[in-house]
């Protein structure tokens, strides 16, 4: 039939358009088929109020998170982290003093061992994840992690907002590449309240960035919060509250998340590395002291 021949001639064009729209995230029916595999990661350098608030909110939703707490916080609030570990939270070690780029192996090993012992003394569970400042790592980090039996090190994002896992063939330790997003002229950084705040973002702008990421249909992502920011301040917490209710994301425990991510096994030399940090000195649009706290934290110092 003439009309059928005409339709057949146009079918490749329609198909090409559909594929193009799918790639940029404009086909809702395709987007709705597979929810994003999402992981919440909490970081704490200060006190405990933000972590406790996150714990309450996640508990109401039947969720847990990956938590990185600096050694001083672990030591000051050991009962909290013992409880969190018992509830199923994965407690990661962190050395925030320096990025582990081009740091001697012996120093990395000693620092990592100290962190591991501190975490395990409190949680009574093996420390499976480690990260340094800016999620920096190099081959010495992998060597040290292998020597200490640490399963994962955290790395700066190398695939945009897509979070992924690399398995260097030379090592047993895997690299978790976190979600990474650009902002203005301040380069790229983690999909994280502090990272965006330090680059001059407001809570409203963070909401816009995150909304676009969640709508893009990524297979896997990591949403990070410095709990003393996102867990305490109203404008920033509301962004996370909305994200937790997003029907296009399945928020997973750490074990569920890593088991669902496709592992990229390749030689270390072929694994991409990101060393860009343009916000070493924060340049916030609104300083912390001028942000409005959540009602239950007003009048408290942190």
Model-derived regions: residue spans:
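N-terminal secretory signal peptides that target proteins for export/translocation
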Residues: 1-10
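Bacterial N-terminal signal peptides
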Residues: 14-25
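Boundary/entry segment of secreted carbohydrate-active catalytic domains
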Residues: 32-53, 289-299
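C-terminal domain-boundary segment and adjacent tail
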Residues: 58-65, 73-76, 83, 152-158, ...
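Metal-dependent polysaccharide deacetylase catalytic core of the NodB/CE4 family, i.e.
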Residues: 61-141, 160-164, 171-194, 219-226, ...
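Short, surface-exposed basic-aromatic patches at helix termini and helix-loop junctions that form
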Residues: 82-87, 142-151, 168, 241-245
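Short hydrophobic/aromatic-enriched beta-strand-loop microsegments
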Residues: 90-92, 149-156
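Aromatic-anchored helix/helix-loop segment that forms the rim or "lid"
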Residues: 183-214
């Amino acid at each position: 039939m003439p009309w059928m021949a005409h339709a057949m001639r146009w079918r490749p064009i329609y198909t090409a358009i559909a594929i193009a729209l799918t790639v940029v995230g404009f086909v809702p029916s395709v987007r709705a088929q597979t929810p994003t595999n999402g992981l919440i990661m909490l970081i704490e350098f200060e006190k405990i109020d933000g972590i406790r608030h996150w714990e309450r909110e996640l508990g109401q939703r039947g969720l847990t998170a990956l938590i990185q707490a600096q050694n001083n916080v672990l030591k000051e609030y050991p009962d909290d982290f013992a409880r969190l570990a018992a509830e199923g939270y994965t407690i990661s070690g962190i050395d925030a003093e320096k990025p582990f780029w081009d740091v001697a192996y012996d120093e990395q090993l000693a620092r990592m061992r100290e962190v591991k012992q501190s975490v395990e003394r409190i949680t009574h569970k093996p420390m499976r994840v480690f990260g340094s400042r800016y999620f920096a790592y190099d081959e010495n980090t992998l060597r040290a992690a292998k020597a200490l039996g640490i399963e994962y090190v955290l790395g700066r994002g190398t695939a945009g907002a897509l979070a992924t896992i690399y398995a260097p063939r030379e090592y047993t330790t895997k690299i978790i590449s976190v979600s990474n997003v650009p902002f203005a002229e301040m380069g790229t950084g983690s999909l994280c309240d502090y990272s965006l705040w330090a680059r001059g973002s407001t809570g409203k702008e963070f909401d816009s960035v995150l909304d676009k990421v969640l709508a893009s249909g990524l297979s896997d992502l990591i949403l990070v919060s410095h709990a003393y920011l996102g867990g305490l301040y109203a404008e920033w917490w509301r962004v996370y509250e909305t994200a937790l209710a997003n029907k296009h994301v399945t928020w997973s425990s750490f074990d569920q998340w890593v088991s669902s991510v496709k592992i990229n096994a390749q030689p270390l030399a072929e694994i991409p590395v990101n060393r860009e940090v343009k916000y070493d000195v924060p340049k916030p649009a609104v300083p912390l002291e001028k942000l409005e706290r959540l009602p239950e934290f007003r009048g408290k110092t942190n």
